[in-house]
């Protein structure tokens, strides 16, 4: 911040009756928010990939926790995942005889999104990765909707390979639709609008 702008800002504070402690707080808060925004713009993909690794990792480690007798924490994690996945026993993988917290399709979706995110992290340093269009993303959803829908209405029973394949197609499609758009948005210059705290 240059001297003239600082003097103008000081004058605005004086005219509005904001004391020196509040001025210091406002400056510290503004600087902190700018730092966090800059950090997120630079490291958003690592954050997304980290969340996916944690989400998939917890789902896979829960049956391991059951096998080692950690029933309390494992049960808690299993119940939390119920909000995000149907966890049908017939549609899930098992480790040590205990069910993974995600069904086969959801596991394929999130794993393929993670692998796509890692691929984007490598490729984005070399060239721009274009986003697919929204209608291509909808097309990526169609096989999963058909497989799940026909099974839901009792027309046929899906199998593990179809669940994995349709989940992977949707996961890759979602990653190719969202991640390049977030990347482009993160590269754009942030709007420099003043933050008014009173």
Language-model regions, residue ranges each:
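Short, highly charged, low-complexity non-transmembrane loops/tails of multi-pass membrane proteins
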Residues: 187-198
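Interfacial helix-loop-helix junctions of multi-pass membrane proteins
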Residues: 88-104, 145-170
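Extracytosolic (periplasmic/ER-lumenal) interhelical loops and adjacent juxtamembrane/interface segments
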Residues: 67-102
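Hydrophobic cores of alpha-helical transmembrane segments in multi-pass inner/ER membrane proteins
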Residues: 111-116, 168-185
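Cytosolic juxtamembrane amphipathic/interface segments immediately preceding
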Residues: 28-41
